[in-house]
Amino acid sequence: MAENQSTVENAKEKLDRWLKDGITTPGGKLPSERELGELLGIKRMTLRQALLNLEAESKIFRKDRKGWFVTQPRFNYSPELSASFQRAAIEQGREPSWGFTEKNRTSDIPETLAPLIAVTPSTELYRITGWGALEGHKVFYHETYINPEVAPGFIEQLENHSFSAVWEKCYQKETVVKKLIFKPVRMPGDISKYLGGSAGMPAILIEKHRADQQGNIVQIDIEYWRFEAVDLIINL
């Protein structure tokens, strides 16, 4: 067993040197496992374990059916701020992109979303889902919920604008983050597919409650981030 472990460690060191030499740049795709094994003289099963160890150290990441990639620089995320993902990414010299996958109404209102109907009752909520990417690699998926009785027509106004911009321009509300919840989770299969991952991949869940000037919760965001893609920074 010790010999097997030593063999895996040796393979991991070879791969580590490959990464440090910059043969594949951040965000770039590694050769296939067969090609890597031939290039580095590593057996297939040993190579797979070494790759998994490097993934656990956030040095590489997988995309389902697309192979292994070198981890990009982590995105510095301050979730307590109202700055949009686009603006924060550009300020860090990154190339952001994003998109919506659904904009609809839902009558399924679990206890987590109860603050949205505490002041203004409603039997439905707007549900908006989407993703964000850096340099073409998707790094997070989000679900956003809003009470249509508080902000009628919000999903029609959204288009490609930020949520905070729509609140200010169309509803004259300035929103601030009032509550944050962080959880390490295994990503559900229906969500991981949007990020090119597989069911059960490790992720960081961020639940964000946004309030208006009166302190009423008007928006709840639930975000799933690839664990190797983000550093969370809270400014006190």
UniProtKB/Swiss-Prot annotation:
HTH gntR-type domain segment(s): 5-73
GO molecular function: DNA binding; DNA-binding transcription factor activity
SUPFAM superfamilies (UniProt xref): Chorismate lyase-like (SSF64288), Winged helix' DNA-binding domain (SSF46785)
GO biological process per UniProt: negative regulation of DNA-templated transcription
Protein keywords: DNA-binding, Transcription, Transcription regulation
The UniProt record lists the keyword Ligase: no
Portion annotated as DNA-binding: 33-52
Protein name per the record: Uncharacterized HTH-type transcriptional regulator YihL
Gene: yihL
